[in-house]
Amino acid sequence: NRDVAACARFIDDFCDTLTPNIYRPRDNGQRCYAVNGHRCDFTVFNTNNGGNPIRASTPNCKTVLRTAANRCPTGGRGKINPNAPFLFAIDPNDGDCSTNF
């Protein structure tokens, strides 16, 4: 099913792997995890419109995604606070992580 609970187990790996990267303004990082014939899409997005490239906070990533997973059974997104530059998202979906051409 597309329940976010099946995706929550990947939060630490996603945040530990993608937040150390440097993101230009309006740039993002994504990762897909396969689970039980479905997929879990995760995103980190630098919402700044200008400025220097920056790194996301690993603890903020984990806090936001855990909060979304606990409050939103079909997935969600958010920031640690309204002025924070990074948006984090967790999105369970049907299908697998492969791309069909």
UniProtKB/Swiss-Prot annotation:
GO term, biological process aspect, one: regulation of defense response to virus
InterPro entries in UniProt: Y3-like_dom
Can the keyword Disulfide bond be found in this entry's annotation?
A: no
Q: Which Pfam families match?
A: GBD_Y3 (PF22803)
Please give the superkingdom of this protein's source.
Answer: Eukaryota
Q: Which UniProt keywords apply?
A: Antiviral protein
Q: Which cysteines are joined by disulfide bonds?
A: none
Tell me, in a sentence or two, what this protein's role is.
Has antiviral activity against tobacco mosaic virus and antitumor activity.
Designated name of the protein: Antiviral protein CAP
The root-end lineage is: Eukaryota, Fungi, Dikarya, Basidiomycota, Agaricomycotina
